[in-house]
């Protein structure tokens, strides 16, 4: 239970968290730019324009199907259209009321065709979030359709339930004072937006997302949304450019511009959610494994294989989220290294999304891993193009000697590398034992 003392303690620690918050935002901004966030927002804007009518039709139909929510339908409509078009909500609502009534007259095939645009919107949003969360594989089609249907049906019910609870709270507060009611009504849109964004970041990406990270991203997106509403309204009022150019049709570009703003805010909130685990892991996460030195790549790969071997002893695999926790080098590095190890046939992903080792680590060596990751000196160095100078043969001799030395030193099997020292035995004695078993001289 959150007591007043704990709340005061959290508030006292808040100023100390500001540098971290600034750092997360500074990390998220270039991440958003590199992921082409504005271009994706533009694409989602036009897809949303086509999908809104069937989406709103289903949403309001669900409200009508539950008599208890019937009286809340108008409140829900007001909240939805205020979020969709804060400055021209009345005009947009009038248009969509007409569109929704026209959609009711469609035949079965027409309804199916119209509904496909809603499915395409969901797939587009899923693809955008998968890019942000570095999910390389989409869900199976059946799972995707079921997730879409769950979001489409559950969200209106949650909205209705929250409005019902809020109405009861407002009724109780009216007896105590007007200020409390005003504050609650002012905060309600932002709270609902934060809840919706949090669920979106949790449910849609094909990636395990911690609820705390999704909550932080949802709150950040909701705050940006409320600030954007105010700024958008002030801009439209102060600079009536669209009304001057388009006249009565100005509602169309204004509505498109606002949808573009909404999707930019949503995608940036998703970037913050995806950035948090990377930020906790440290600065190394700003690059993928290709940005690391060779020795660092090998260390990350060996750390992943070590965790997979430990899990294999229990007969289980490890999910990516667990790996990111146990090997805290950041999501980018973990994802990239898993892809490289999978391409080299060292690991594989199971149907339930867990990762397992596919090679017998008792026989495999560090040198095998080095070659699989492309870090060895390969190729015929004595014949490169038309080069045939004497220095070329001498350089080839040096490379061959270096490769032979590396092969000798790194020919340690993972069973020996991962061996725990017996109780009371220093790690140096274990190193000596490894040398004796493998016949190596010098340091490992």
Curated annotation (Swiss-Prot):
Keyword Membrane (UniProt): yes
Region described as Disordered: spans on this chain: 423-444
Subcellular location: Cell inner membrane
Family annotation (HAMAP family): UPF0761
Membrane topology, as annotated: Multi-pass membrane protein
Pfam family, one: Virul_fac_BrkB
Entry-linked InterPro entries: UPF0761_bac, Virul_fac_BrkB
Species this chain originates from: Rhodospirillum centenum (strain ATCC 51521 / SW)
Gene Ontology CC terms, in alphabetical order: plasma membrane
Protein's name in the database: UPF0761 membrane protein RC1_0578
The family this protein is said to belong to: Belongs to the UPF0761 family.
Keywords linked to the UniProt accession: Cell inner membrane, Cell membrane, Membrane, Transmembrane, Transmembrane helix
UniProt key word Membrane: yes
Spans through the membrane: 49-69, 103-123, 145-165, 186-206, 219-239, 248-268
């Amino acid at each position: 239970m959150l007591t007043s003392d704990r709340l005061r303690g959290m508030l006292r620690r808040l100023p100390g968290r500001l540098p971290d918050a600034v750092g997360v935002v500074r990390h998220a901004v270039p991440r958003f730019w590199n992921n082409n966030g504005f271009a994706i927002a533009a694409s989602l804007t036009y897809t949303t324009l086509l999908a809104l009518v069937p989406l709103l039709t289903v949403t309001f139909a669900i409200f009508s199907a539950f008599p208890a929510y019937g009286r809340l339908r108008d409140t829900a409509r007001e909240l939805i259209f205020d979020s969709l078009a804060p400055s021209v909500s009345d005009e947009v609502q009038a248009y969509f009321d007409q569109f929704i009534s026209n959609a009711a007259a469609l035949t079965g095939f027409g309804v199916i065709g119209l509904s496909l645009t809603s499915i395409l919107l969901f797939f587009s949003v899923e693809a955008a979030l998968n890019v942000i969360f570095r999910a390389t594989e989409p869900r199976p089609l059946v799972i995707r359709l079921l997730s879409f249907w769950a979001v489409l049906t559950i969200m209106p019910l949650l909205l209705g339930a929250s409005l019902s609870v809020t109405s009861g709270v407002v009724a109780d507060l009216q007896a105590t004072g007007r200020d409390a009611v005003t504050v609650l009504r002012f905060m309600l849109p932002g709270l609902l937006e934060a809840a919706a964004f949090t669920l979106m970041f949790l449910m849609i990406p094909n990636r395990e997302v911690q609820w705390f990270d999704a909550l932080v991203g949802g709150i950040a997106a909701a705050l940006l949304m409320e600030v954007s509403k105010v700024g958008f309204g002030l801009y439209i009022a102060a600079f009536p450019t669209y009304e001057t150019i388009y006249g009565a049709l100005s509602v169309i570009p204004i509505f498109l511009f606002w949808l573009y703003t909404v999707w930019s805010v949503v995608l940036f909130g998703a970037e913050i959610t995806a950035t948090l685990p990377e930020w906790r892991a440290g600065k190394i996460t700003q690059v993928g494994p290709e940005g690391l030195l060779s020795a660092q790549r090998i260390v990350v790969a060996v750390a992943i294989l070590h965790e997979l071997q430990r899990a294999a002893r229990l007969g289980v695999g490890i999910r990516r989220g667990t790996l990111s926790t146990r090997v805290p080098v950041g999501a980018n590095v973990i994802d990239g290294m898993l892809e490289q190890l999978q391409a080299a046939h060292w690991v594989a992903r199971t149907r339930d999304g867990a990762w397992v080792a596919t090679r017998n680590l008792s026989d495999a060596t560090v040198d095998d891993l080095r070659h699989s990751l492309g870090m060895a000196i390969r190729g015929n160095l004595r014949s490169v193009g038309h080069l045939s100078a004497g220095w070329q043969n001498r350089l080839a001799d040096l490379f061959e000697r270096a490769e032979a030395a590396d092969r000798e030193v790194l020919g340690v099997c993972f069973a020996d590398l991962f061996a725990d020292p017996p109780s009371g035995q220093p790690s140096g004695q274990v190193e000596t034992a490894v040398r004796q078993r493998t016949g190596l001289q010098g340091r490992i």
